[in-house]
Amino acid sequence: MQLVWDAIALHTTPTLALHKEPEVVMVHSGIAVDVLGVGLDRIPQDKQRAILSEFPRLAFKTQFKGCLCNVVRQKPMTTVDNILRDFGIRYVEGFAPPNFADLVANAPFSE
């Protein structure tokens, strides 16, 4: 169960995912190809066409952006230390991202 959790939780954190078990590395790498095109050049063109024919992207970029921006709007505190912050800054009007320096400064301690 821990392996599955790690693969899901770390798939957007290459600085950690690439140093974990092979399954975690593969989940991260597969998602990186699918979402960002990282490593796409290592897949032959005929294979790419076959894959995209079987699994069309169906406006993936637009839909993905919309989903992430909805999370930013509904749960802005979940944007600390992940890709949601970037989408909020770029696409969500009025988004004021949580900032770690502010979190420390506003911690409930007297000193």
What annotation goes with each model-predicted range?
Residues 1-16:
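Histidine- and acidic-residue-rich, metal-dependent catalytic cores
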Residues 13-111:
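Divalent metal-dependent phosphate-bond-processing catalytic cores, especially two-metal-ion Mg2+/Mn2+ enzymes
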